[in-house]
């Protein structure tokens, strides 16, 4: 959902523009190996084997009954026996404020405040009998929450004046910008259906700050020369 407000105060000397948006996205990720498998698998081979092994899907097996290493796997099995999902929550908001001084209307003050926050977490489940993770007894783990944060502050003053007596106009701006980014991911382990760790991903914490100061002067004479 989203909301937008545009109030003004003090006889339009102060104008605000307020925006806020929130969202929840639920994602399902397919095993993309199914694309290659579908394009290369022998189309005359039946999808289902009629057996309980490998979830009932036909797979190339060796003399031990295990999937053949490097063989093309059943694309339908790759899709249906892989449950990978995530949920991402996000909020974006900003406020713009413009203020013209009552006693000095040629001077405008502006401020922008912005905030962007996202948090995501997910889970992966592949049953132990699936051919795609047969040697590791499947997968069963969760990860997250991964967090991203962005803050913005912009402040500037603008003076705009036309002096007809000397056929001149002045446009002066001075400002300041602050931006902050933060991205964090907690430590998590990929585990099989037996609770055994298969792989561990390290935690990460990245932060960046950007500061800017700026100024500008535009002068024009007789509406021709700048």
Name each model-derived stretch.
Residues 215, 222-226:
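Short, intrinsically disordered, charge-balanced linker/junction segments flanking boundaries
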Residues 6-92, 110-213, 220:
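Surface-exposed loop/interface segments of Gram-negative outer-membrane beta-barrel transport/assembly proteins
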Residues 1-5, 100-107:
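A conserved hydrophobic secondary-structure block that centers on an alpha-helix together
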Residues 10, 102-104, 222:
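Residue-level recognition of beta-strand termini and adjacent short loop/turns
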